[in-house]
Swiss-Prot record:
Stated name of the protein: 5-dehydro-2-deoxygluconokinase
MF GO annotations: 5-dehydro-2-deoxygluconokinase activity; ATP binding
Lineage, uppermost ranks: Bacteria, Bacillati, Bacillota, Bacilli, Lactobacillales
Keywords: ATP-binding, Kinase, Nucleotide-binding, Transferase
PANTHER family assigned to the protein according to its UniProt record, in alphabetical order: 5-DEHYDRO-2-DEOXYGLUCONOKINASE, HEXOKINASE FAMILY MEMBER
Pfam families: PfkB
Cysteine pairs bridged by disulfides in the record: none
Listed HAMAP family: IolC (MF_01668)
Function, as annotated: Catalyzes the phosphorylation of 5-dehydro-2-deoxy-D-gluconate (2-deoxy-5-keto-D-gluconate or DKG) to 6-phospho-5-dehydro-2-deoxy-D-gluconate (DKGP).
Family: Belongs to the carbohydrate kinase PfkB family.
Catalytic activity, reaction form: 5-dehydro-2-deoxy-D-gluconate + ATP = 6-phospho-5-dehydro-2-deoxy-D-gluconate + ADP + H(+)
GO terms (BP aspect): inositol catabolic process
Protein's organism: Lacticaseibacillus casei
Amino acid sequence: MPQKFDLIAIGRAAVDLNAVEYNRPLEDTKTFAKFVGGSPANIAIGSAKLGQKVGFIGKVSDDQLGHYVTQYMASVGIDTSNMVKDDTGHKIGLTFTEIISPEESDILMYRNEAADLYLNAHEVSRAYLAQTKMLVISGTGLAQSPSREAILKALLIAKELGVEVIFELDYRPYTWQNAEETSLYYQLVAQKADVIIGTRDEFDVLENHQGRTDQETIATLFQYDANLIVIKSGIQGSNAYTKAGETYHFGVFKTKVLKSFGAGDSFAAGFLYAYQHQLGLETALKYGSAAASIVISQLSSSEAMPNLDQLTAFIEKAEAQEVHQS
């Protein structure tokens, strides 16, 4: 029987309150715009906008903000049947952003007792996971129990079912106790994941070792289940490494940068679309880079996620300009 979903993401769905006023610090900002946030939710939204069939497993607050998140995700085509409402009073995570300049933007997270961290293992459905080709796991969901156990249960079920596991490192220090704890749980998932995606700094967190080279990192991780590792290095672009020994690189597209946050989630959505459609790893890196460039040029992260026509048009225009300039 063919699977219903191209991918299911599990973990954090939250609310972003993005500063509408630019060039000023958060303490001086008075006006914010509300959007859906959280790395797994953003990846799910980006994937759905690209035409993927997407499901989501997570927990949100049973209030107006929780309803807003669920309704928005459903409106872009995501199946929300496995998004659980917290009935114990936990509130959804909030993220405030400031945009001081294109080079200097920051986030302030309120995640104490956040509802997504209270997803329980019994709320993860084997029958639901059996309907997907791919499971996207975000590192933040491993930060606390019971979400940690829910994520690990989903991982084990996916491996048993032959579902491809994508581990997006998504390191956020706010909810972790210490570096050793983070590295321990990151390594547990990384050793079972088929594809691992993160920044160079996030891989240092995974290994709890600063200053490692990409070659040292992949030599360690390819001893386990991973067959593809994607390491992002900011303006230097990104590299995809295969267990077979192939290396692919793509740089970054020039764009008018408004903010620095949101790039990683859009990169993952674009990359995974091309990867799952077998367009080649160089094209996957290109799609990821283009999606990231589109999102960092706009105020929102989730609502700025491009559809496939917008993504390919951006790439065609950028490549045409590059040829013209050369």
